[in-house]
Amino acid sequence: MKIKNSLKALKGRHRDCQLVRRKGRVYIINKTAPRYKARQG
């Protein structure tokens, strides 16, 4: 999982990337290609 300051660019890396908020943190999740997972922080 990558940890980035801004996730806007990471959302466009793959068409299945989704932006979700969990427990006050922002994540990118991708069920078809899990290597694109990322967290903001």
Curated annotation (Swiss-Prot):
Family per similarity comment: Belongs to the bacterial ribosomal protein bL36 family.
Disulphide-bonded residues: none
UniProt-listed InterPro entries: Ribosomal_bL36 (IPR000473), Ribosomal_bL36_sp (IPR035977), Ribosomal_L36_bact (IPR047621)
Entry keyword Plastid: no
A GO BP annotation: translation
UniProt keyword annotation of Ribosomal protein present: yes
Pfam family, one: Ribosomal_L36
Keywords attached to this entry: Ribonucleoprotein, Ribosomal protein
Gene Ontology cellular component terms for the protein in this record: ribonucleoprotein complex; ribosome
Lineage: Bacteria, Pseudomonadati, Pseudomonadota, Alphaproteobacteria, Hyphomicrobiales
Name of this protein: Large ribosomal subunit protein bL36
GO molecular-function term, one example from the UniProt record: structural constituent of ribosome
Organism from which the protein derives: Brucella anthropi (strain ATCC 49188 / DSM 6882 / CCUG 24695 / JCM 21032 / LMG 3331 / NBRC 15819 / NCTC 12168 / Alc 37)
Source organism, top-level taxon: Bacteria
